[in-house]
Amino acid sequence: MSSSFSEECTPAKQKYDTCFNDWYVNKFLKGDIHNRECDDLFYEYKQCLFKALKVKKVEPLLEAARKED
Amino acid sequence: MSVYKDESEFDAPWENISSAWLRRYPNPYSSHVVSADVLERYIDEKGRLHTERLLVKQGRVPRWASELLNVSKSYILERSIIDANKRELLSETFNIDHLKLLKAMEYNRYQPSQEDSSKTSITTLAQFASPLRLGLGRRVQKYCLKRFPEQLIGSRRGILYVLQKYKSFS
């Protein structure tokens, strides 16, 4: 399983990834798209990730890329 | 701008390929991809899964690039739309830094092969545009174009590697 670009987020990311991978194969691909069992784990992971994107100054790069769309 | 097009086929059903694609990092053929983060993920009104990921690539930078701009790391944005009904995965990837040197875009479409729906066909389109002047830009684009087929083989081997590793898919 891949790491987060910010080391301290890797545990939360891997927990979320495990949930998502299982959801993708066993729910999404089988047409069960309304099941949201990984939302809480995604939220936790995102809290960590978005803080890190700010601290490590990646946010401006993302904003510039989105502006170009 | 330089453009590269390619079509290929995987001897595995679309469901397995799309699962492997989503979890293709890390793999020994993409050791330069050091991290993959999910920035955004949602299901749209048509039931399609949208994902935006941030990839960080490290090392493996040509000497002229590191000399020119002190490049050793690059941030890549990857967006995908997965339609399980249509059995289609669309992706686009592009760098969001070092844009003064190069903008590299890659588009892929994965869908069941027309002749045999237990196989998966991939269509790839890559574009390289460098804003550098004095003929340098053209050289950069040419360099990328020359290296791309090899990278493509690597990324496909990576997907197959992950596919083998998780044989229990779906």
Model-derived features with residue positions:
Chain B
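Terminal "cap-and-tail" regions of soluble proteins that handle hydrophobic small molecules
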Residues: 2-7, 64-72, 83-170
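Generic detector of isolated residues embedded in canonical secondary-structure elements
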Residues: 15-16, 79, 123
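Short edge beta-strand segments in beta-sheet-rich domains
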Residues: 33, 75-77, 105
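Glycine-rich portal/gate segments that line the openings of hydrophobic small-molecule binding cavities
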Residues: 39-93
